[in-house]
């Protein structure tokens, strides 16, 4: 089975090695889809009061209001200073961030949660399956990538969020959509952003890739009861979302750099984007399940 999943280690190694030259990559040139996870990005308006404050390779969003702001995702352990600098560059104060939410409990998206919480004083909102991981700084065997997971700094001030909970700050209201699959605690977020009277439904859809270490099998319901069914339910829920503007934790997964910034050439809005994003993930999941079936003990094939 090891051969099937060596791609995961290669992808992580490539992404991390490409960050070594991050300080030499001028943010003003815009970002490429193959950018390193820590390559600096210009802060940009996405739409209305939603701003991109992440790196070229990993998303972070700031949703703003006069009553305070909500930060969405924390990127890698190295990205905290970039996120804070981008917030300030837009004219906002990190101290005015009143809540922090995130997509899922892996180091490339929760890596700077503790640092950003300390800088802002804001609580981190998390669904129950992610809380122990955030407190420990490491996942357990319920995470498909458990054996290759990188540690993060433990997070102290965590507010438990219902699967369909709402995080509110003044007029802002971000609604959680439980999205287990890539991780147990994965969460998609939806909210409204307006430019004048033109309001759009924003969707920050969690990663939906069926990637694991060499041990985890999505088809093994005895070892992971209900996990595959929950993953499939996630795909159905994301596909059905009211979705005008899609952003994903890895910006390249939703073609973000072709829609905002210096290289933008495609429309920002696409009401079919969430459906197509989920459909692609469903196809990859079915391919993964077929690979697992082909290497199961009953198939006669060697893992």
Model-found features: residue ranges?
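Bacterial N-terminal signal peptides that target proteins for export
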Residues: 1-9
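Conserved beta-strand hairpin/beta-sheet module of binuclear metal-dependent hydrolase folds
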Residues: 36-90, 94, 188-210
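Bacterial N-terminal signal peptides
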Residues: 9-18
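C-terminal regulatory/interaction regions
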Residues: 267-303
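Active-site HxH/HxHxD metal-binding segment of metal-dependent hydrolases
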Residues: 50, 78-81, 88-166, 266, ...
């Amino acid at each position: 089975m090891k051969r099937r999943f060596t791609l995961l280690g290669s992808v992580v190694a490539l992404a991390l090695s490409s960050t070594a030259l991050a300080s030499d990559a001028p943010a003003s040139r815009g970002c490429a889809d193959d950018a390193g996870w820590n390559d600096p990005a210009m802060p940009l308006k996405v739409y209305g009061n939603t701003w991109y404050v992440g790196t070229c390779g990993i998303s972070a969003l700031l949703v703003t209001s006069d009553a305070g702001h909500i930060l969405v995702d924390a990127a890698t352990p190295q990205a905290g200073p970039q996120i804070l600098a981008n917030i300030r560059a837009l004219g906002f104060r990190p101290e005015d961030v009143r809540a922090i939410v995130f997509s899922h409990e892996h180091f490339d998206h929760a890596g700077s949660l503790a640092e950003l919480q300390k800088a802002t004083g804001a609580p981190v909102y998390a669904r129950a399956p992610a809380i122990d991981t955030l407190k420990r700084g490491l996942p357990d065997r319920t995470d498909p990538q458990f054996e290759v997971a990188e540690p993060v700094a433990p997070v102290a001030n965590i507010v438990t969020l219902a699967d369909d909970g709402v995080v509110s700050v003044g007029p802002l209201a971000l609604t959680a959509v439980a999205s287990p699959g890539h991780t147990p605690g994965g969460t998609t977020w939806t909210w409204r952003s307006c430019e004048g009277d033109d309001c759009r439904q924003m969707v920050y859809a969690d990663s939906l890739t069926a990637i694991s270490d060499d041990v985890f099998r999505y088809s093994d319901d005895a070892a992971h009861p209900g996990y595959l069914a929950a993953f499939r339910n996630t795909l159905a829920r994301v596909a059905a979302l009211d979705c005008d503007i899609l952003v994903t934790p890895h910006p390249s997964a939703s073609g973000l750099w072709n829609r905002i910034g210096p290289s933008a050439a495609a429309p920002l809005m696409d009401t079919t984007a969430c459906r197509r994003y989920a459909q692609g993930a469903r196809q990859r999941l079915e391919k993964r399940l077929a690979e697992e079936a082909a290497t199961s003990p009953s198939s006669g094939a060697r893992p």
